[in-house]
């Protein structure tokens, strides 16, 4: 029997969803501590209204997590669900971590030491209100702001992690009440995509080498309430929450062309689950997963030439549990583990990714997270 709770549409759109520490300058590579004894790290943010922190969990070779520290962002969160994906981002070298501060309307950057611990570089205005999602390609950073009329805004990042606004980069979304969830660069850094829950559309922007963007071109979503998404090469997989209707959510796949047009490959492949909101690809691109907030489950799809097919007829590839409300997903760089943040469970669950794409729950996740914890990265 499927476990689900029907989310009111307003709740889905909103949440399917301490004192500052002074900024510290980044360390040079020679000042970094020795390599970590762990396989890697997993990061999330508290989204705390009194002061936001990035939480570090060290990742062992068996996928298990142990607390590794907390790091003030210099900004504040909201203390509540944000209805977003990708509130944290790593640059391609893994040297810098960025996070949004939805309460103070800022972006923070950190230097990532070799052991995964963080040094705050600084925090800067996001170019709008209530930043929800951040993305980076090379030295170009973009954020989508969900407050007010909503907009995107771009920045260059220096070799020391300092952000500078790109003139003219603050561009509108498709409407003044679009309900953005995520922004992300295409793998080549020339296209930006924003999902808009309230307008059932995707806004697409073209990005010049200097970081300036043009757009949006508005593409109707195949299904209602497009939410999270992930790229693998030219293939884009987007979750569709369908307003939180029971067992009605889906995922669509698109091919992203160089001119920014999106061509549907598979339209609205059902999850048979409730409120599919977050998406992650396996490292090899053969599988895609959605976190189904209303069902407490994860749905897996095989991906062949961009076409989606359910791994399990009932749509249940992994089970987090009743009331767990899984939201963000992250895959370890070695492709061995999928991590899921549960907003209801206040925990991070760990699943082994098997060769056939199936998931096996493994012990050793993280527990006792604060309400409102948001975002997930694996390094």
Question: What kind of feature is each model-predicted range?
Answer:
Residues 67-79, 119-125, 167-173, 214-220, ...:
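A short beta-strand motif characteristic of beta-propeller blades
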Residues 118-182:
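Asp-box/WD-like beta-propeller blade repeats and closely related beta-sheet repeat scaffolds
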Residues 44, 99, 143, 194, ...:
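Residue position within the beta-strands of beta-propeller blades
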Residues 57-64, 110-117, 156-163, 205-212, ...:
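Short loop/turn segments immediately following beta-strands, especially the blade-tip
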Residues 47-49, 59, 102, 112, ...:
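Short loop/turn segments immediately following the C-termini of beta-strands
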Residues 74-93, 126-140, 172-191, 221-242, ...:
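Beta-rich, blade/repeat-based domains predominating
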Residues 13-37:
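Bacterial Sec-dependent N-terminal signal peptides
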Residues 343-379:
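Blade-level signature of beta-propeller repeat domains, shared across WD40, Kelch, NHL, RCC1
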